[in-house]
């Protein structure tokens, strides 16, 4: 309204809602170590007592896809699928598949849970969350992302342990839950044209920030840019 748009309003809509709970991860054998982790959107829960199992390593999403059916029964799949650094960040879409599809594939292979390397290239211990999808008929499993330093540490542990025939075991505690339907809304504003019969031009952006971030980049900046573009049209 302060920018001068007309008929500014909120269009409510219902949406299924998932909320995260407690989150922790630690390697219990053979090299005990706590790790930084966060649940992926739509992850199932391990239960309050958590889940401890052997970790099976896959370098890429394709390697996970090639695993024999049932080969991961009762185990935790770990997929690295290291994202390539680019100036524009364009590789995010390509490497995001491990987050979107990996948990569903692991569930179909019989895995008890899955952890992935965070999709990103920054070396800090803030794991990167995001949504994941499970195909119809596939029961969701606990699914989470490790911070990049922790994912690389886990890779080193697995490589070292394999030389002596040891299995790496991890304990996960993830307690997210689905809380049913809640209400959100689209913010709509209009710039009346000079000819009502000429049709409508739609300018828009989305704000789908996850709870762990501010949404400044995805997509607060984009919303601000599109709003400014619409104002330029209005003021022309």
Show which residues each predicted segment covers.
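Noncatalytic luminal/extracellular "stalk/propeptide" segments of secretory-pathway proteins
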Residues: 1-76, 80-88
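Acidic/His- and Gly-rich active-site-bordering loop/insert found
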Residues: 3, 8, 14-18, 39, ...
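Structural recognition of the beta-strand scaffold that forms the well-ordered cores
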Residues: 9-10, 55-57, 76-80, 112-117, ...
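Solvent-exposed loop/turn segments at secondary-structure junctions
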Residues: 14-18, 62-63, 83-86, 119-123, ...
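Second-shell loop/turn segments in exported
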Residues: 24, 42, 46, 53-58, ...
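A conserved hydrophobic secondary-structure block that centers on an alpha-helix together
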Residues: 60-122
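Alpha-helical metal-binding/catalytic segments enriched in His/Glu/Asp
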Residues: 98-99, 103, 187, 203-236
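Long, well-ordered, tryptophan-enriched scaffold segments
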Residues: 108, 112, 134-186
